[in-house]
Amino acid sequence: MCIRDSTSLGIPHFAGISLNQIPGDPDSIKGSKVRGVYWTKPDSTGKEVSRDVAIEEEKYTEFVKDFEHTYFKEVYDVLSKRYKLGRMRLLLKEPRSTLSWHRDPEPRLHIPIYTNPGAIMVVDKVAQHMPADGSVWITNNTKYHNAFNGGEENRVHLVACVLDYKFN
């Protein structure tokens, strides 16, 4: 099982477990490849900079063997019949923490697994709590966004990159 904690990912209070990988390439779920490329405006100049490495999302087609006989595989199979998916990960946001204001290359599909009322996602300055009620959310992560957990319990989402979803 490939669990990456906040230390190995380089982001405080964040952890990820990759559920699929590039076929035959266990390194495709390690280090910065759990995060992937994103863009941010880190200072008062407002100049956008790129962080991390580009990911070839369309190559992530093999489910990690440790998770083949789990409900996550069933969910992956159902969703991949409807959407073209890239990486699918379990992402943890620890209590009282936030990500940077950033944007990603593609939309994301979220299924909240464990959450609390203080766990909020802000996309293009619109805040939304996603309850863990079995709903599937698709967020436009190509717009600037962040996720924060202002609660006192962990937030865990099943998150997949969606390669063929177009917003109006």
PLM features: residue spans?
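Conserved small/polar residues in nucleotide/adenosyl-binding loops
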Residues: 1-6
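Signature of the catalytic double-stranded beta-helix
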Residues: 7-92
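Residues that flank catalytic or metal-binding motifs in active/ligand-binding sites
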Residues: 86, 105-107, 154
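Short, conserved beta-strand element in jelly-roll/cupin
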Residues: 92, 103-119
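Tight coil/turn sites that cap or link beta-strands
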Residues: 94-96, 133
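Short beta-strand His + acidic residue motifs that chelate non-heme Fe in jelly-roll/DSBH
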Residues: 99-102, 119-121, 130, 139-151
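A short hydrophobic beta-strand segment most commonly corresponding to one strand
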Residues: 109-112, 136-138, 152-168
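A short beta-strand-loop-beta hairpin characteristic of the jelly-roll/cupin
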Residues: 112-132
